[in-house]
């Protein structure tokens, strides 16, 4: 405590008038200490152990120790000559963020979702926008409404590419060519403004920096990698937070704060960094950053569906953290592609990761599964058995022998809480993508013979889709493009490569005909997308080598 007093000697008293002008260092909301029910609230201690402490040290003790103990201790040790209150204020976070980040104690209702229109209120017409989409979950998160806007100059940025590709060669050269042709063929968007990057691996970050213009906005769903990208740029180009007033004047940190960039760069970055968290919707207000000679704006994430399920409801807290913390992703699966085998059974044998989904292969099929979702997998005799086991796990408070395989809460331990989806016919391999969760590769082996449709059961409200294996699709397409000197597209034109799934009634027996019926309904206003509508479904699936991906259709 004596060291703290010495370090903070001469610092003037904090006041409410100062605090309300300061933003939370994590979520960028304005701080206030008047109303606990309103955003930005931070609390002061009700009583102090030492009444002799003067008010300024009381406030400082609270702000530095009550909210962010580890960060503040290190900051004081590394910066014993701290002289200004401004750099102390930059460390302050609101009560909501403090509880969520340091105690993992948060109410999802305090992290409200925003719509695209809500977020666009921050963005002036004609602005430069980077639409941030995690490539690992492509095509989920890709919003054509953003790319097609005439009042914005939009570039598509595909993040987390290290979770799809082995090295950055494909990311640098092959992805932009593929995406240009995909956007043109699929969405009728003629654009060559696409970047694939990995902020964690520093792939293409220099190229990205050289490309983006001054006053650029980062726009995307929650947890797509916006803040991680910003922090990578801040470290690489010695960036920092700035404030821009109503006249457009840029207010940079004080000289004392900027001096720390040279005397203690590690601590300087901690103060300036964007708030990165596994908690969605953490960012609540726009935050500007000076990155080199350019201004970059971090926008709150927006959601495209009001009916979307909050993953906090069905999924266990520890499992959810593993799903969302992308730095924990194990890249050995990308290089080795270790698979698990499973044979379809007459009882409806299923494969699951934590109960988050149940994959049911058709009877007699031999399948290989490569899992890119954290957590141990498990097979069960049928879905009912899996749900029954996980129900017992939730009732046993962790003592059940299979508790390590359980990633769901008791609220989802009923079959009625899941939706049944049929996967349209395919031959070879596909990737099944679950929004905000990850993906698995599914491969059927042996001589092709149609044995039925694969099914997947997923909690209601979770979005799912399929795609042809992305890495192989882009690699083979690039080879074809180069070998023909660009005459052939790197993105296939003879078939769709992505598709939504088809919801089935729990008792539907003829899933193939039900899929065709649903396909015709979904494409009623998109007749140009229809294929094989005159073929009998059961004749069609006998010739998948020639008539690929029947009934594949993605609803944007």
From Swiss-Prot:
Keywords: Mitochondrion, Transit peptide. It is found in: Mitochondrion. InterPro entries: G_CP_dom, GTP-bd, Mito_lipid_metab_GTPase, P-loop_NTPase. PANTHER family: GENETIC INTERACTOR OF PROHIBITINS 3, MITOCHONDRIAL. It comes from the Eukaryota. Interacts genetically with prohibitins and thus may be involved in the mitochondrial lipid metabolism. SUPFAM superfamilies: P-loop containing nucleoside triphosphate hydrolases. It comes from Saccharomyces cerevisiae (strain Zymaflore VL3). This is Genetic interactor of prohibitins 3, mitochondrial. Residues 1-21 form a transit peptide. The gene is GEP3. GO terms for cellular component: mitochondrion. Pfam families: MMR_HSR1 (PF01926). Residues 113-305 form the CP-type G domain. Belongs to the TRAFAC class YlqF/YawG GTPase family. GEP3 subfamily. The keyword Mitochondrion applies.
């Amino acid at each position: 405590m004596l060291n703290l007093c010495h370090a903070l000697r001469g610092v003037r008293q904090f006041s409410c008038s100062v605090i309300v002008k300061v933003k939370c260092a994590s979520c960028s909301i304005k701080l206030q200490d008047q109303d606990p029910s309103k955003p930005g609230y931070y609390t002061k201690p009700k009583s102090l152990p030492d009444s002799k402490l003067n008010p300024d040290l009381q406030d400082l003790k609270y702000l530095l120790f009550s909210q962010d103990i580890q960060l503040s201790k290190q900051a004081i040790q590394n910066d014993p000559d701290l002289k200004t209150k401004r750099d102390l204020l930059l460390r302050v976070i609101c009560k909501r963020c403090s509880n969520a980040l340091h105690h993992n104690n948060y109410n999802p209702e305090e992290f409200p979702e925003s719509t695209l229109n809500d977020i666009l209120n921050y963005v002036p017409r004609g602005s430069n926008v980077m639409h941030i989409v995690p490539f690992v979950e492509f095509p989920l998160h890709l919003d054509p409404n953003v790319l097609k806007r005439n009042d914005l100059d939009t570039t598509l940025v595909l993040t987390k590419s290290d979770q799809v590709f082995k090295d950055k060669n494909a990311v640098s050269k092959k992805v932009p060519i593929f995406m240009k042709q995909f956007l043109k063929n699929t969405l009728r968007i003629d654009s060559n403004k696409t970047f694939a990057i990995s902020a964690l691996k520093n792939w293409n970050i220099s190229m990205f920096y050289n490309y983006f213009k001054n006053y650029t906005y980062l726009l995307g769903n929650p947890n797509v990698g916006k803040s991680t990208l910003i922090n990578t740029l801040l470290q690489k180009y010695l960036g920092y937070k700035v404030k821009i007033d109503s006249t457009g004047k840029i207010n940079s940190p004080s000289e004392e704060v900027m001096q720390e960039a040279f005397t203690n760069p590690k601590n300087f970055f901690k103060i300036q960094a964007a708030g990165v968290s596994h908690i969605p919707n953490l960012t609540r207000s726009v935050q500007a950053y000076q990155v080199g000679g350019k201004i970059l704006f971090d926008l709150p994430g927006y959601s495209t569906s009001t009916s979307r399920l909050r993953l906090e409801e069905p999924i266990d807290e520890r499992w959810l953290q593993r799903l969302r913390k992308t730095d924990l992703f194990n890249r050995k699966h990308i290089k080795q592609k270790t698979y698990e085998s499973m044979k379809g059974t007459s009882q409806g044998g299923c494969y699951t990761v934590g109960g988050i989904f149940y994959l049911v292969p058709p009877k007699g099929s031999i399948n290989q599964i490569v899992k890119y979702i954290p957590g141990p997998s498990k097979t069960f005799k049928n879905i009912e058995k899996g749900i029954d086991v996980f129900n017992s796990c939730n009732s046993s408070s962790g003592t059940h022998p299979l508790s390590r395989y359980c990633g769901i809460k008791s609220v989802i331990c009923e079959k009625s809480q899941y939706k049944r989806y049929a996967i349209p016919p395919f031959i070879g391999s596909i990737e099944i993508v679950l929004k905000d969760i990850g993906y698995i590769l599914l491969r059927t082996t042996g001589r092709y013979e149609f044995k039925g449709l694969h099914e997947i059961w997923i909690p209601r409200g979770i979005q799912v889709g399929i795609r042809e294996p992305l890495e192989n699709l882009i690699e083979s397409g690039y080879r074809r493009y180069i070998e023909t000197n660009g005459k052939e597209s790197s993105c296939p034109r003879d078939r769709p490569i992505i598709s939504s799934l088809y919801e089935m009634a729990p008792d539907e027996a003829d899933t193939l005909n039900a899929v065709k019926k649903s396909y015709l309904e979904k494409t009623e206003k998109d007749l140009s997308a229809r294929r094989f509508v005159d073929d009998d479904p059961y004749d069609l699936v006998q010739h998948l080598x020639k008539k690929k991906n029947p009934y594949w259709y993605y609803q944007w």
